[in-house]
Curated annotation (Swiss-Prot):
The species this protein was found in: Conus bayani (Bayan's cone)
Tissue specificity of this protein: Expressed by the venom duct.
Domain of life, source organism: Eukaryota
Keywords: Amidation, Cleavage on pair of basic residues, Disulfide bond, Hydroxylation, Secreted, Signal, Toxin
Pfam family, one: Hormone_5
InterPro entries: Neurhyp_horm (IPR000981), Neurhyp_horm_dom_sf (IPR036387), Neurohypophysial_hormone_CS (IPR022423)
Signal sequence range: 1-20
Keyword Transferase appears in the UniProt entry: no
Source organism phylogeny: Eukaryota, Metazoa, Spiralia, Lophotrochozoa, Mollusca
Assigned GO CC terms: extracellular space; secretory granule
Modification Glycine amide occurs at: 29
Family: Belongs to the vasopressin/oxytocin family.
Disulfide bonds: 21-26, 43-83, 46-57, 51-73, 58-63, 90-108, 102-120, 109-114
Descriptive protein name: Conopressin-conophysin
Length: 121
């Protein structure tokens, strides 16, 4: 029984620490996690800001997630060249998605989630 519990704990730890990339043509580390500056372009702009993920549009006034305005950001997935989200780096305390960008005052986002963050002021 002890070995099974230990194996399940290791499996859960492995699952929580891996970063999956579900966007087509993702480079190593994720589409928006490229820091070398080579072959990277700015992510496309949406109705009131910048696309952060396939369903996330953020600007100075906040973020829209899953709305009609943010649906244009899905086109970003069709481009094989990785893009760079403007904004300082921030850390989220979500399993698997720890590196994000400050995209709006008080908001830190990755390509699939956003969270309030005191470091993004």
């Amino acid at each position: 029984m002890g070995r099974l519990t230990m194996a399940l704990c290791w499996l859960l730890l492995l699952l929580l620490t891996t970063q999956a990339c579900y966007i087509t043509n993702c480079p190593r580390g994720g589409k928006r996690d490229v820091d070398d500056g080579l072959g990277v372009r700015p992510c496309m702009f949406c109705s009131f800001g910048q696309c952060v993920g396939p369903h996330i549009c953020c600007g100075a006034g906040g973020c829209e997630i899953g709305t009609l305005e943010a649906s244009t950001c899905h086109e970003e997935n069709e481009n094989p060249i990785p893009c760079h989200v403007f904004g300082d780096r921030c850390l989220l305390k979500h399993p698997g998605n720890v590196h994000g960008n400050c995209v709006s005052p008080g908001v830190c986002c990755t390509d699939d989630t956003c969270s309030m963050h005191v470091g993004c002021l």
